[in-house]
């Protein structure tokens, strides 16, 4: 409940609107949001057969876009993300990000750029190794 969050220190802002349980409101807000529907690891799901078809996560990648890269290959396969910002509640617990490595993020971006240019669907370094 929103009232519990407010009683326990949550500061009232626009983000609280994502917690409103109203199908019409959620549908409208998902429709008007300016963010693109993308695959993000914190709140994603797919059919197992689709994940297998793209060979899962590229295990050469690390934090900093590895989830987006999987979603981009699903997109290349013809699987499109849905915008559910206001339909599927997701709360994030703050944590330090000591594992962030700029060089690894640059590598991830390079792989994503290659995949987009060449319409890559299946990774060689995923569930099944080639």
Q: Where are these predicted regions, by residue range?
A:
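Acidic donor-binding loop at a coil-to-helix junction in glycosyltransferase catalytic cores
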Residues: 63-70
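Active-site donor/metal-binding and catalytic loop motifs
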Residues: 84-101
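A residue-level structural signature of the nucleotidyltransferase/glycosyltransferase Rossmann-like core
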Residues: 43, 82-83
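Terminal low-complexity segments of carbohydrate-biosynthetic enzymes
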Residues: 80, 103-130
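Hydrophobic residues within well-ordered alpha-helices
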Residues: 74-75
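Conserved nucleotide-sugar donor-binding catalytic segment
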Residues: 47, 54-62
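Conserved donor NDP-sugar-binding/catalytic core segment of glycosyltransferases
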Residues: 1-11, 80
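A recurrent flexible, glycine/aromatic-enriched loop bordering the glycosyltransferase active site
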Residues: 9-19, 23-45
């Amino acid at each position: 409940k929103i009232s519990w969050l407010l009683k326990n220190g949550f500061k009232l802002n626009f983000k609280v609107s994502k917690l409103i349980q109203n199908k019409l409101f959620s549908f409208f807000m998902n429709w008007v949001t300016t963010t693109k529907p993308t695959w993000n690891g914190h709140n994603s799901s797919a059919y197992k057969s689709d994940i297998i078809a793209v060979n899962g996560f590229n295990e050469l990648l690390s934090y900093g876009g590895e989830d987006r890269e999987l979603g981009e290959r699903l997109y290349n396969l013809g699987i499109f993300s849905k915008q559910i910002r206001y339909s599927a509640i997701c709360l994030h617990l703050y944590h330090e990000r000591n594992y962030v490595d700029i060089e690894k993020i640059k590598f991830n971006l390079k792989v994503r750029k290659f995949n987009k240019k060449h319409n890559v669907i299946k990774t060689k370094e995923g569930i099944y190794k080639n």
